[in-house]
Regions:
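Cell-envelope/extracellular polymer assembly enzymes that use nucleotide-activated donors
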Residues: 2-5, 23, 33, 181
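Short aromatic/hydrophobic "clamp" motif used to bind/position activated sugar donors
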Residues: 85
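Short, well-formed alpha-helical segments that are part of the catalytic scaffolds
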Residues: 12-26
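Membrane-interface aromatic/basic loop that binds lipid-linked glycans or pyrophosphate carriers
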Residues: 265-329
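Glycine-rich, basic loop-to-helix element that forms the pyrophosphate-binding segment
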Residues: 64-80
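Catalytic core of nucleotide-sugar-dependent glycosyltransferases
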Residues: 200-206, 213-239, 258-288
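A conserved acidic beta->alpha catalytic loop
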Residues: 38-48, 65
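Donor-binding/catalytic cores of nucleotide-activated saccharide
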Residues: 69, 90-194, 204-218
Length: 329
């Protein structure tokens, strides 16, 4: 059996850490190297990591000064020795046979990366997040351009560690959206990718998590820096025109559509809405005929119309109506 290195960044997750590590230790695939990276957590997380390591010899603990999620992941990768590499966030947990299924797929297809679906859990409600790419065969970005539209989460992928190291794409320290900053680069460099159309990971959305409590000034700055980096890498590699439609969609979705919806519902006075609007206009041309936008649901097309014509009151009204209906049900 091939060794799999599982990197788990740990910071202020006392309530969730044991559940996370237990789900890894109890995998049906047992050839694991579990690396817990205590990122200077001010609570008992460091002690808990040591206690967990005493119970399972496959666990090793790295204590370091706080440097953020990206820095913790990068530090864990440096310690990894397995053929394969998996990231698990410490407030999440994984399906019992995730590693077994992902490794079997990687070995069968000789892949650089294996993608899989996941459960998004918010307020106890589970929703499967999937993507529209073919499964059961070897693919690449060159063959499947819409890979660029797949969820960027690093934890929804198993990496061949040799490929990961050669790609030389560490997570950017100090920035939000570290997965968005790196995944499109991995897709560009990977020659063999496979996709398991099955949810194997539980992603937990918490009210006080990094992203739900994000600062809008830093969030907008980091989002734009990350997207500019992606566009720059594709241009440097002579691939911008090849993937123009996907890259323009990536900018529209990440720097305009999604953050603008959030800001409207939060009652933003227009400062950050205009910031995202100006950025998007400066980076992409006319996307009205973008094939991916044309595939949107009527609801998303309506939301885009609302944003384009600044009819924010209508989006707030629709959101309020949905909440009222949901409460009655």
């Amino acid at each position: 059996m091939e060794l799999v290195s599982v990197v788990v960044p740990v910071y202020k997750v006392e309530q969730y850490l044991e559940r996370c590590v237990k789900s890894i230790c109890e995998q049906t695939y047992q050839e694991l190297e579990i690396i817990l990276v205590n990122d200077g957590s001010p609570d008992r997380c460091g002690e808990m990591c040591e206690e967990l390591a005493q119970k399972d010899k496959r666990i090793q603990v790295l204590h370091k000064q706080n440097g953020g999620l990206s820095d913790a992941r990068n530090a864990g990768v440096k310690l990894a020795t397995g053929k394969y590499l998996l990231f698990v966030d410490s407030d999440d947990y994984i399906v019992k046979n995730l590693v077994e299924k992902a490794v079997a797929e990687a070995e069968k297809m000789a892949c650089d990366m294996v993608l899989f679906d996941y459960y998004c859990v918010e307020n106890g409600i589970e929703e499967v997040r999937t993507t529209q790419i073919p499964g059961g065969k070897v693919i690449s970005l060159e063959k499947e351009h819409q890979l660029l539209l797949a969820p960027p989460a690093a934890w929804a992928k198993l990496f061949n560690r040799e490929f990961y190291v050669k790609a030389d794409c560490p997570f950017p320290k100090g920035l939000y959206f570290e997965d968005l900053a790196t995944t499109p680069i991995f897709f560009l460099k990977a020659e063999r990718i496979s996709y398991l159309k099955e949810p194997l990971y539980y992603y937990i959305i918490r009210e006080n998590s990094i992203m739900t409590g994000k600062n809008h000034e830093k969030s907008s700055h980091d989002k734009m820096e990350v997207l500019d980096h992606i566009l720059s890498v594709y241009r440097e590699n002579g691939k911008y025109e090849t993937y123009r439609e996907e890259l323009e969609y990536l900018v529209l979705a990440n720097a305009y559509f999604e953050p603008s919806k959030e800001l409207v519902l939060e009652g933003d006075d227009g400062t950050y809405l205009q910031k995202y609007r100006d950025y998007t206009k400066s980076r992409i041309g006319n996307v009205k005929n973008n094939k991916y936008i044309n595939q949107w649901s009527r609801k998303d097309k309506l939301h885009l119309w609302i944003l384009n014509y600044k009819q924010y009151w209508l989006m707030r009204l629709l959101s309020k109506a949905r909440r009222m209906v949901s409460t009655k049900l």
